[in-house]
């Protein structure tokens, strides 16, 4: 399955909620969802009532789109979360939040996760002093992520830092913008991830059918 490369604003409209996929633009009056808060297409303004399956499917699609993950990989995360001891929902969110592209975004070195994935792919980051160019690389507590010295003048990174400098970072991450680095302190607790607009239990139920 190919990665979606179309207009990401259509994804927000499809899910009926802001997914903040374009970063800075999502906070302005240019946001496509604010201007047209209905599904794309000829019949987009006529939303039908969803079945229980439809609700679960939409929840799953929403989480995938927020984190920019394809179906097979997301399914593997769910399987891994189910096999681990403890709350499956928390296990899943910890796997998603530990991805390198997500952590780069959370630290504020990218405007959105899509941009973070591209920057990681192009080798602009070090993890514990070593170059890692795999967006799905899973970080462990106390891992240090750093912008490579030769990448610190890249305009999109500088712009992201400027945009995020005054914004609060999440409690499981520590950031030092002046030195272009941050630390993944620990895995987050489920209740700490407050910007996920769906109930993960609904997602788990979709894969438990």
UniProtKB/Swiss-Prot annotation:
GO terms for molecular function: rRNA binding; structural constituent of ribosome. The keyword Nuclease does not apply. Keywords: Ribonucleoprotein, Ribosomal protein, RNA-binding, rRNA-binding. GO terms for biological process: ribosomal small subunit biogenesis; translation. Residues 98-166 form the S4 RNA-binding domain. Pfam families: Ribosomal_S4, S4. InterPro entries: Ribosomal_uS4, Ribosomal_uS4_bac-type, Ribosomal_uS4_N, S4_RNA-bd, S4_RNA-bd_sf. The keyword rRNA-binding applies. One of the primary rRNA binding proteins, it binds directly to 16S rRNA where it nucleates assembly of the body of the 30S subunit. With S5 and S12 plays an important role in translational accuracy. Part of the 30S ribosomal subunit. Contacts protein S5. The interaction surface between S4 and S5 is involved in control of translational fidelity. This is Small ribosomal subunit protein uS4. The gene is rpsD.
